Curated annotation (Swiss-Prot):
This is SKA complex subunit 1. Keywords: Cell cycle, Cell division, Centromere, Chromosome, Coiled coil, Cytoplasm, Cytoskeleton, Kinetochore, Microtubule, Mitosis, Phosphoprotein. A motif (Slightly degenerated SXLP motif) lies at residues 92-95. The lineage of its organism: Eukaryota, Metazoa, Chordata, Craniata, Vertebrata. The modification Phosphoserine is found at residue 241. GO terms for biological process: attachment of mitotic spindle microtubules to kinetochore; cell division; establishment of meiotic spindle orientation; mitotic cell cycle; mitotic metaphase chromosome alignment; mitotic sister chromatid segregation; negative regulation of mitotic spindle assembly checkpoint signaling; regulation of microtubule polymerization or depolymerization. Residues 88-129 are annotated as: Disordered. Residues 56-90 form a coiled coil. It is found in: Cytoplasm, Cytoskeleton, Spindle; Chromosome, Centromere, Kinetochore; Cytoplasm, Cytoskeleton, Microtubule organizing center, Centrosome. Component of the SKA complex, a microtubule plus end-binding complex of the outer kinetochore that stabilizes spindle microtubule-kinetochore attachments, promotes alignment of chromosomes at the mitotic spindle equator (chromosome congression) and assists suppression of the spindle assembly checkpoint. Kinetochores, consisting of a centromere-associated inner segment and a microtubule-contacting outer segment, play a crucial role in chromosome segregation by mediating the physical connection between centromeric DNA and spindle microtubules. It comes from Mus musculus (Mouse). The modification Phosphothreonine is found at residue 156. InterPro entries: SKA1, SKA1_MBD_sf.
Length: 254
């Protein structure tokens, strides 16, 4: 109780002291000699107040600018991380950049060599017609996105295109043997050639196809459940069709 009374007395005394100071300042303001000085001080206070308002607005602007710069830095950091991720995960099946032939300096033809070339000699054999081996096209990101989730499960875009790369390897290996003259074949290739012929049907005529035996012969792929899932996806993406018969499934490149 005594403590509260002392606090109240202290508070009242403080207020009385403030009133006395105000009254003394008021009396000073009535002095004609000080009115001009007080007026100037008032003008200075107004000017300082306006300056403080400008400082406050500038501080708000700087805070907004700082916030925008932080957001920009964060956005740039994320973009840099995305670029680094792309650099580190470039699909291996993408074509490599090569120098074009137009940039390669070709030496001027030697007139003497041209004269020699024009001299009649032994007739040359006509060049053998280059046979084109049809390869499977890689799937695009849009096509991969359209594959139902239940079908692709945890398979990635790159994993599917890696399988396509191996399938193309098997196709090229098979049809290089098919296009090779039989006289130059080894016994192993001759046996493979005969198997290729036996596997053909009227439905595969004029088309490039492989069977599981070709996958095992020319690649290191395992013909397992994952392989069949990917073949199902490739059929969904119209990269191949299946021709069955004689206990074989022929994967026709479309």
């Amino acid at each position: 109780m005594d403590s509260e009374l002392e606090d109240l007395c202290s508070y009242v005394n403080e207020k009385i002291g403030n009133i006395k100071k105000i009254l003394s300042i008021r009396n000073l303001g009535q002095d004609p000699a000080l009115k001009t000085t007080l007026s100037k001080i008032g003008d200075e206070i107004i000017a300082v107040n306006e300056l403080l308002n400008k400082f406050e607005l500038e501080i708000q602007y700087q805070e907004q600018t700082n916030s925008s710069l932080k957001e920009l830095c964060e956005s740039l950091r994320e973009e840099c991380e995305d670029v680094e991720h792309l650099k580190e995960h470039v699909p291996p099946h993408l074509p490599q950049v090569t120098a074009t032939q137009s940039l390669v300096h070709k030496p001027e033809p030697d007139p003497k060599e041209s004269d020699k070339a024009e001299e009649p000699g032994l007739p040359k054999k006509p060049p053998r017609e280059q046979r084109i081996i049809k390869e499977m096209q890689f799937i695009t990101m849009d096509e991969f996105s359209d594959v139902p989730a239940y079908m692709k499960s945890r398979l990635t875009y790159c994993q599917i295109n890696d399988i396509i790369k191996e399938i193309n390897k098997a196709v090229v290996s098979k049809y290089k043997i098919m296009h090779q003259p039989k006289a130059s074949m080894s016994s192993v290739k001759r046996n493979l050639y005969q198997r290729f012929i036996n596997e053909e049907t009227k439905d595969t005529k004029g088309h490039h196809f492989i069977v599981e035996a070709d996958i095992k012969e020319f690649t290191a792929l395992k013909v397992d459940k994952r392989f069949y899932v990917i073949m199902h996806i490739l059929r969904h993406c119209h990269r191949l069709s299946e021709v069955r018969g004689g206990g074989l499934t022929r994967y026709v490149i479309t």
